[in-house]
């Protein structure tokens, strides 16, 4: 599945706004993930998962930075996220379904933070983009 030129333009355009709030968006997305899907906490037994904790903020920042890497390499997302895919598949052994859960939580966060920008067209583009990201992150599982 690949993005159309229009979808790519939407992603890159919105990213300019998102990147200015990356840390906050990452933290909020993880808080939403852990609240909505508490089973995902099992991958972070060594983290303080209280809302706003330093570890949660740091990991949220990493998550959004990885999304940013995918945006910057929108024509080669696989290349941009290959090492991250290996890490999650071989070392962390994260269940692939969690990427979809995280993607959904990011979509909700973006919709809440950017209601004027998050039109139906933008929602569809971000959903497709995050599906591509999730697919790339699960490539090494096969």
Swiss-Prot record:
The modification Phosphoserine is found at residues 53, 73, 82. The keyword Transmembrane helix does not apply. The modification N-acetylserine is found at residue 2. Keywords: Acetylation, Heme, Iron, Metal-binding, Oxygen transport, Phosphoprotein, Transport. GO terms for biological process: cellular oxidant detoxification; hydrogen peroxide catabolic process. GO terms for cellular component: haptoglobin-hemoglobin complex; hemoglobin complex. One of its GO terms (molecular function) is heme binding. The modification Phosphothreonine is found at residue 29. Residues 2-142 form the Globin domain. Heme b binds at residues 59, 88. Pfam families: Globin. The keyword Acetylation applies. Belongs to the globin family. Heterotetramer of two zeta chains and beta-type chains. The zeta chain is an alpha-type chain of mammalian embryonic hemoglobin. This is Hemoglobin subunit zeta. It comes from Pan troglodytes (Chimpanzee). The lineage of its organism: Eukaryota, Metazoa, Chordata, Craniata, Vertebrata.
């Amino acid at each position: 599945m690949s993005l159309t030129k229009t979808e790519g333009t939407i992603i890159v355009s919105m990213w300019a706004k998102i990147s200015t709030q990356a840390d906050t968006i990452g933290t909020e997305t993880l808080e939403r993930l852990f609240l909505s899907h508490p089973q995902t906490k099992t991958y972070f037994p060594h983290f303080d998962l209280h809302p706003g904790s330093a570890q949660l903020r740091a990991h949220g920042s990493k998550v959004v930075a990885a999304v940013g890497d995918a945006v910057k390499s929108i024509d080669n997302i696989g290349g941009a996220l290959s090492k991250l895919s290996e890490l999650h598949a071989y070392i962390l052994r994260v269940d692939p379904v969690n990427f979809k859960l995280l993607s959904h939580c990011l979509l909700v966060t973006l919709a809440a933070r950017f209601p004027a920008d998050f039109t139906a067209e933008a929602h569809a583009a971000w959903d497709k983009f995050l599906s591509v990201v999730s697919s790339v992150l699960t490539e090494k599982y096969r």
